[in-house]
Amino acid sequence: MIIFKNLILKISSLRFAISLIIFIAITSGIGTFIPQGSDNKFYVDNYNSAPIFGFLDGEKVLKLQLDHVYTSFWFLFTLILLCISLAACSFRRQIPSLKASLKWIEYKSEKKFSKLQLNTSHPINQDGDHISKVDLLLKKRGWKTYKFKSHISARRGLIGKIGPLVVHIGLIILLIGSAYGSFTSQSKEQYLLPGESLDLVNESTNSKANVKLVDFSIERESDGIPKQFISKLNFYSEDLNLNEIKTAKVNHPIRLKGLTIYQADWAISTVVLEIDNILYQLQLKEIPEIGNQVWGVLVELGSETKNNFLLTIDNENGPLKISNIENFSGENLYLNDDPLEVNSSKVSLKKVIPSSGLIIKNDPSIPFIYFSFILIIFGTIISLIPTNQLWILVNKESQKLSIGGLSNKNLVGFKKEFFKLSEQIKNF
């Protein structure tokens, strides 16, 4: 029993909770640094030759489950331990503190008033119902009072005592929701060309929906740097009686029927070329060896002798660079411009078709996450409300009215109010 109590004391301590939070923050940072969810070969190939921090090679990454940090047993165990720590702290400290603050404390002796943060006294006449007058004044000022025969206990701002408990509940819901989302969330990245569609199935409701990319555009700065990617999507579903068009932008996802669709990326998927009076629609692939966001394709050009040429492009407005793979000399081909003669073939660029990179995510834990943040914000705000307490004692033998006060926050502000009330009571 003693061991169990000592364990609870340790788990519910602030130092222990802070240690867990720091550990979670560090491991979460590692999870963003190391790519998550790739196959084992990726980690072995990339980290055996260049270990992380000089000692974490591919085998150690896999063994320590750093390839899936957020669903690893040790990360989830830490979340559970933090939940237990917060719950233990709530039951051991917050709830008893709240219960204690609900009890009315009586100060029947003038000696006790000298120990309070603020105290003063005034002479009174034996005649007059001073307690009733003070009680009425305090109630008008928004104080909750408990009147006795010769003394009054008053308090205000008790809701501030609930704040830490609400924050703890919000954090527990956040941790549980995060763990739940790690196992239940589904995510899919899809590139769509204008006119292409994607069928979505919600397994929990067995409902189907079709998402069609109506239009995709890119806003650019004056220097050509991408500013915003915009996808106009049509959602259609007979099961859900749905047919509407919504717009997804970077940092402005679409939320619909439990799904969240993010505008995540873009690509140049296709170019339409006219080669010797024949139209060709060529599929492009990203070529990271040449540069960031450069797409290209290898084609044969020439009416008599065929030679290989590399076509590359990095902007939906062009130009398309045509390079000879032997010496990488090349020319730029502009959109809807005059044809270029390349190895005796006439080539013109008719159309550049960019595709929209979308991430479609189904995360049942989102409502829990949002609700937890609401609780945390609400709890933090109300915890800033000071809890003030007043005691008034009438001693007819010494013909003195004593006033004392306590405040857990903003003592300066409470001090001003305290002496203002004292002057009003003095005038009785």
Curated annotation (Swiss-Prot):
Compartment(s) of residence = Cellular thylakoid membrane
The transmembrane segments are 14-34, 72-92, 162-182
> What does the protein in this record do?
Required during biogenesis of c-type cytochromes (cytochrome c6 and cytochrome f) at the step of heme attachment.
GO terms, biological process = cytochrome complex assembly
Q: Does the keyword Lyase apply?
A: no
Name of this protein: Cytochrome c biogenesis protein CcsB
**Major subcellular location class:** membrane
Pfam family name, one: ResB
Which keywords, in A-to-Z order, does the entry hold?
Cytochrome c-type biogenesis, Membrane, Thylakoid, Transmembrane, Transmembrane helix
- GO cellular component terms attached to this protein's record: plasma membrane-derived thylakoid membrane
